Amino acid sequence: MQSIYLSKIREQNPLIHNITNIVAANFSANGLLALGASPLMSANIEEMQEVPKISQALVINIGTLIGKDREAMLQAGKTANEVGIPVVLDPVGVGATSYRRETISQLLAEVKFALIRGNAGELAAIAGEAWQAKGVDAGQGEVDLKAVAEKVAQRYGCTVLISGVVDIVSDGTQTATVHNGTSLFPKVTASGCLLSAVCAAFLAVSEGNYFSATLEACVAYTIAGECAAQGLTTQVGQFQIRLLDELAALSPETIGQRGRINE
């Protein structure tokens, strides 16, 4: 594929507002910096009418819901909608508890999302499909994940990215699969959360072309993972650091040469 957006991220240094979980915050912030974006990590409800107005994209991640997080997410999402910046939803573990399900239902009802990014279990839960999730992990199921992606995209008028061994990107009318990646991704906590943040950076410079921006973000991130995993087997600590290095080193040429996509 031809890289369109990576250079724009590095030229524009978009500010990405993250309301994310306590497990992922540091990794997501450093990953955005490595990529060329600028992270802003705030979940303070008192700031949610102001921070989205100075940001170029918003990530809402429900991984560790505490205190007034839900209210802050709703306020930030509505403010982001008002000012016209893309909002990314990461519905971490949505199928695990009733509180998470209620939170996602309310967010989807009151906030317009540009992208929903999650694993198979999370997107199956949103689609109302049977799936045996394992906490915040993907779990197992037998449903057609392409159909799930298309169903959710059509229902909410957004782009959907289902992460897995093969990643699926759909906006309800066009669907693509990405075949890059590494088996070390699931061994590092918050690697999916960082992907959501990376997607937000790509969406921030896409001028509304959310499908193509999500597709390039997914390809870029999974290629960085492949490069980081070279020569490693079980060294997940090294992989985590190398992933940041590879995001910083990633070039449009590498994306064009190494991307494996079926459309």
UniProtKB/Swiss-Prot annotation:
Any GO BP annotation: thiamine biosynthetic process
Sites where the protein binds ATP: 117, 163
Keywords (A to Z) from UniProt: ATP-binding, Kinase, Magnesium, Metal-binding, Nucleotide-binding, Thiamine biosynthesis, Transferase
Keyword Kinase appears in the UniProt entry: yes
GO MF entry, a single one: hydroxyethylthiazole kinase activity
EC numbers for this chain: 2.7.1.50
Summary of the function given for this chain in its UniProt record: Catalyzes the phosphorylation of the hydroxyl group of 4-methyl-5-beta-hydroxyethylthiazole (THZ).
UniProt similarity note: Belongs to the Thz kinase family.
HAMAP family, sorted: Thz_kinase (MF_00228)
The protein, known as: Hydroxyethylthiazole kinase
Organism field: Haemophilus influenzae (strain PittGG)
Taxon lineage: Bacteria, Pseudomonadati, Pseudomonadota, Gammaproteobacteria, Pasteurellales
